[in-house]
């Protein structure tokens, strides 16, 4: 037989090419599947944290109770905000803290801030005016909690109990910890965010 010409390469049988491509494709699919499983696992762990934190009721002694703002209508708290404030009214007689910080600014055209509406509501229900601190400028949870941290730091305080809706508890606590507060949460159990809307917001927070 003739000697092979240098550089000539025997063609790879079609079956072997197909097998190689099958193995490569299988590895790609396996890698994608692992990534999806890990991603879903991380998401469901986060969702569990949102759910568990939202059901916490850590009402030990702190420097201040911080109630997160929500919508108000010309000085009247929305049902969502009123539920949070009612929880503060329940906590106040327990002597958990000597101060309540009300939070939240307003939108253009509003005569009152969320903090002002909250303060009026609490004062009408027995929380002394001189126990109320106002954070009137925040338009997001982060802005409000950051401003609260500054207000309390000026008084040498940093331990807080955050009152909010269950779905909002974990995010509020994490923000508070990020800005230097020693934070715990006590979620309202009379939230008007229920059923499918509550589930949607829990999923969104995760």
Regions inferred by a protein language model and the residue ranges of each:
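N-terminal targeting leader peptides, primarily classical Sec-type signal peptides for secretion
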Residues: 1-3, 16
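A structural signal for short, hydrophobic/glycine-enriched beta-strand patches
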Residues: 3, 7, 47-200
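N-terminal type II signal-anchor transmembrane helix
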Residues: 11, 15-57
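Short, intrinsically disordered, charge-balanced linker/junction segments flanking boundaries
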Residues: 202-206
């Amino acid at each position: 037989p003739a000697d092979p010409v240098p550089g000539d390469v025997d063609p790879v049988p079609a079956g072997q090419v197909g097998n190689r491509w099958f193995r490569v494709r299988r590895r790609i699919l396996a890698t994608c599947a692992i990534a999806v499983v890990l991603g879903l696992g991380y998401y469901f762990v986060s969702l569990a944290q949102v759910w568990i934190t939202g059901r916490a009721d850590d009402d030990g002694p702190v420097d201040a109770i911080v109630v997160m703002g929500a919508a108000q209508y010309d000085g009247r708290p929305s049902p969502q905000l009123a539920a949070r404030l009612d929880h503060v009214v329940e906590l106040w007689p327990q002597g958990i803290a000597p101060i309540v910080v009300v939070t939240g600014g307003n939108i253009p055209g509003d005569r009152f801030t969320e903090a002002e509406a909250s303060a009026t509501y609490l004062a009408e229900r027995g929380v002394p005016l001189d126990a109320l601190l106002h954070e009137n400028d925040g338009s997001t949870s982060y802005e409000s909690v950051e401003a609260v941290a500054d207000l309390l730091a000026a008084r040498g305080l940093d331990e807080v109990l955050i009152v909010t809706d269950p779905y909002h508890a974990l995010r509020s606590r994490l923000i508070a910890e990020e800005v230097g507060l020693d934070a715990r949460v006590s979620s309202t159990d009379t939230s008007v965010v229920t059923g499918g809307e509550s589930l949607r917001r829990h999923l969104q927070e995760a």
